[in-house]
Amino acid sequence: GPTTGLLVLIDGHPQYMGLMGHPIADACQSMLADRVEVVRGPASVLYGSNAMGGVINIVTRRMHEDGVKTDLHAGYGSYNTLETEVTNQVRAGRFTSTVTGSYNRTDGHRRNMGFEQYGGYAKLGYRIAQAWDLYADVNLTHFNARNPGSVSEPILDNRQRITRGMTSFALRNDYGWTSGTLSFFYNWGRHRINDGHSPGEEPLNYRFNSRDRMLGVSWYQSVALFRGNRLTVGVDWQHFGGKAWNAFT
């Protein structure tokens, strides 16, 4: 696909469909993000062949000061568009947590262009020692989408039902002059798609189905040997794949 050369990361972990190799943009929701880092241009030396066109790294939320914070966001607009999000963040001593959920929908500006999405995210953290932190998080999203095709070449019954999930664990250290992370991640997806048909043609008698997965372990340690210098060493291992089939109706 055209987006296979752009690598999307969440907290440094790659996010793409394990069979097709492209990112699923709808799985990267704004409710996750504390900030977004962008590497422009080819970065394959550090990130692999998926980074030929650049890298987008989404850094997830966390509380930096003790307290409890709850945010509620809701918006409504044209074409019956609704977006909602609620987030609760806690920091109490060594413990931190972030829990957020969202619901979004729209009818679209054309017939058969509806979209609906549910999402949830949770992240827990604990400071083991002054320079050591442990984190675990999970992200789930499901969306239903319809595609009407182009105005000149419309498509009927083109529907998608897609579920994506992600979980990760990370052990981090930061001594100032040296820092590093040991992490594990596991991503999975379930796709059910009706490719649709042109007006006047018979509806398809099958639905495309797939299950995909991607998992990996990575470690790196960075050290500043002298002023203006930083040396980083690391290693990672990844496995991806899945299964695709047509289910006849």
Where are these regions (language model features)?
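Short strand-turn segments of transmembrane beta-barrel domains in outer membranes
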Residues: 6, 43, 55, 60-90, ...
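Outer-envelope beta-barrel architecture signal
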Residues: 6, 66-70, 82-84, 93-97, ...
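Short acidic/polar hinge/loop motifs at secondary-structure boundaries
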Residues: 13-40
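Transmembrane beta-barrel architecture of outer-membrane proteins
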Residues: 23, 51-53, 81-83, 117-119, ...
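Transmembrane beta-barrel strands of outer-membrane/channel proteins
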Residues: 72-76, 99-103, 136-142, 182-188, ...
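Residues on the lipid-exposed face of transmembrane beta-strands in outer-membrane beta-barrel proteins
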Residues: 86-90, 122-126, 169-173, 217-223
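Flexible loop and strand-edge segments within Gram-negative outer membrane beta-barrel domains
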Residues: 106-117, 127, 131-214
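Signature of Gram-negative outer-membrane beta-barrel scaffolds
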Residues: 226-249
